[in-house]
Regions:
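Short amphipathic alpha-helix that is part of the acyltransferase structural core
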Residues: 1-16, 141-142
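Active-site rim helix/loop that mediates acceptor-substrate recognition in acyltransferases
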Residues: 9-37
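Glycine-rich acetyl-CoA-binding "A-motif" of GNAT/NAT acetyltransferases
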Residues: 29, 37-43, 103
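Conserved beta-strand in the GNAT
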Residues: 34, 40-49, 56, 61
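Conserved GNAT acetyl-CoA-binding A-motif
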Residues: 54, 76, 83-96
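Conserved acetyl-CoA-binding loop-helix of GNAT-fold acetyltransferases
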Residues: 62, 68-84, 106-110
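Conserved beta-strand-loop-alpha-helix junction that forms the acyl-donor binding cleft
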Residues: 93-104, 122-126
Length: 142
């Protein structure tokens, strides 16, 4: 997590970095996953419940040695399935706007996310991009 938070702070000012620290990841509204290859951590991701129908994608990060190997897609697909299994209707995320986030943007757009307005407690910020995906309506997967 220290690597993830440090990376966020290298690309965004502190007031625009919304990464969850370890304590916040322990909140009962957050489910955290990690992908390992043997004893090597390949990537992480989390799902934070905002309410009973809306979740937020958090803490998505791929370890440097695993970039461009499908780890982020694997984690994202797993979180999308869990969100659907929990009957969430919408999954949203906040990410950065700097060039270092281009691969993130491509990943989310590839999986059907679209730009949206700030959600939850977020405010408009030139360093933030907000994306959302409608998962299901009336418990039907879209």
């Amino acid at each position: 997590m220290a690597y993830h938070i440090s990376g966020m702070l290298q690309q965004s000012p502190p007031e625009s970095s919304h990464a969850l620290d370890v304590q916040k990841l322990r909140n009962p509204t957050v489910t955290f996953w990690s992908v390992w290859e043997g004893e090597q951590l390949a990537g992480i991701g989390a799902l934070k419940l905002l309410d009973d129908k809306h979740g937020e994608l958090k803490s998505m990060r791929t370890a440097p040695n695993y970039l461009r190997r499908g780890v982020a897609s694997l984690i994202l697909r797993h979180i999308l399935q869990v969100a659907h299994d929990r009957c969430l209707h919408r999954l949203s995320l906040e990410t950065g706007t700097q060039a270092g986030f281009t691969a993130c943007h491509q990943l989310y757009l590839k999986h059907g996310f679209v730009d949206c307005e700030p959600f939850a407690d977020y405010q408009l910020d030139p360093h933030s991009r907000f994306l959302s995906l409608t998962l299901c309506e009336d418990n039907e997967l879209l």
